[in-house]
Design a protein with these regions (language model features):
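Single conserved hydrophobic/aromatic residue that forms the stacking wall/gate
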Residues: 300-310
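Vicinal oxygen chelate
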Residues: 84-144, 188-193, 238-302
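Catalytic cores of nucleotide-enabled group-transfer and carboxylate-activating enzymes in metabolic
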Residues: 12, 19, 50, 54-60, ...
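Core segments of cupin and vicinal oxygen chelate
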Residues: 1-50, 150-199
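A structural feature that tracks compact, well-ordered secondary-structure segments
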Residues: 22, 53-57, 66, 119, ...
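Conserved active-site tyrosine of GNAT-family acetyltransferases
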Residues: 19-24, 82, 113, 158, ...
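Intrinsic, low-complexity N-terminal interaction/targeting segments
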Residues: 126, 196, 200-204
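N-terminal beta-strand motif that seeds the catalytic metal site of vicinal oxygen chelate
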Residues: 1-17, 62-67, 124-157, 169-171, ...
Length: 310
């Protein structure tokens, strides 16, 4: 199976206005004028109809991620693989297909319980992306819109599913000491790539799933100034900054983390690595970052969290 990229995420909220303000005034996303209405907010960051869809509901939580396949044949092949392995999946309804602006798709759960959609054929959108905050553009196209990081207590089973069923490859593996006590067990993280040059499209960390349903997602801009300006906007709008500016060791991304209205984090970055997979060997980074990325807290990631992670 060859998954091309991360196409979109869906989020549930009790307060669309909070997401509207956050998406436009802090992140610089564009509210799609045609697909947004009183029940949902579609946030556009490039040529696609949207990358974030936020819909009214009883909770504040991440719902699902949509992973893109190349064509109808690839989707049919995925169904055959699932059938052979007795993996349950559901066909997306006509309403779902229209709402997501896709041609066809299915949904299923990974072994950690995360809801995923596989789809093909994103419909064309004639509405040009114009950032309300003057962002020159987000790094997307063949790379997809970014990445998602899930929590998975059954990390080895979940990792095996992504590698051997969905066809991902390992980019980097971390084993981090989260507690000041060196005798405490380390936390494992797998960073996995699909069929594009983004360093990782999905990552999983060995921890309980947070109440928000997701650890974080990521978007990438084209200049370091646009990262700094987003950080200023977040601070000026009283957004919780989950991590200071820093450069990651594995994907070289310069970024900061801020909390979304849904409770999960958004990494806002620049200059992510784009490996040549024909030459890449899986790395084992000894630390999350070369510098910076001081986290204000480590919720849901360790029984003995510390205030700073270097």
């Amino acid at each position: 199976m060859k998954i091309q990229s991360l196409g979109y995420i869906l989020v549930e909220t009790k307060d669309l206005s909070a997401w509207d303000h956050y998406g436009q005034e802090v992140c610089g996303f564009m509210k799609h004028p045609d697909f947004s209405d009183e029940e949902k907010l579609c946030l556009k960051i490039d040529y696609e109809p949207f990358r974030f869809m936020v819909q009214n509901g009883p909770e504040e939580k991440f719902l699902l991620a949509g992973l893109e396949l190349g064509d109808a044949s690839a989707l049919n092949d995925a169904k055959k693989i699932f059938d052979e392995l007795n993996i349950n999946y559901q066909q997306l309804s006509a309403d779902d297909l229209f709402t997501r602006q896709i041609t066809d798709g299915i949904s299923f759960n990974d072994p950690a319980g995360n809801l995923i959609e596989l789809y093909h054929g994103r419909l064309n959108d004639e509405t040009k992306f114009t950032s309300p905050k003057g962002i020159s553009g987000f790094v997307t196209k063949d790379l997809g819109f970014g990445h998602v990081v899930y929590a998975a207590l059954n990390i080895e089973e979940t990792h095996d599913f992504y590698i051997n069923v969905l066809g991902f490859g390992d980019s980097d593996i971390m084993n981090l000491q989260m507690s000041p006590n060196p005798e405490d067990p380390k936390m494992k993280l797998y960073f996995m790539h699909c069929d594009n040059k983004r360093h990782h499209t999905v990552a999983i960390m060995q921890s309980p799933t947070p109440p928000s349903g997701l650890v974080h997602t990521m978007v990438e801009v084209k200049t370091i100034d646009e990262v700094g300006e987003a950080l200023d906007r977040a601070i000026n709008n009283d957004i919780h900054i989950s991590s200071s500016l820093g450069r990651h060791m594995n994907d070289k991304m310069v970024s900061f983390y801020m909390q979304t209205p849904g409770g999960f984090d958004l990494e806002f970055g620049y200059d992510g690595d784009q490996p040549d997979w024909s030459k890449h060997q899986t790395t084992s980074s000894p630390a999350p970052s070369y510098w910076g990325h001081v986290f204000t807290c480590l919720l849901y990631t360790s029984p003995s969290p510390r205030d700073r992670v270097r």
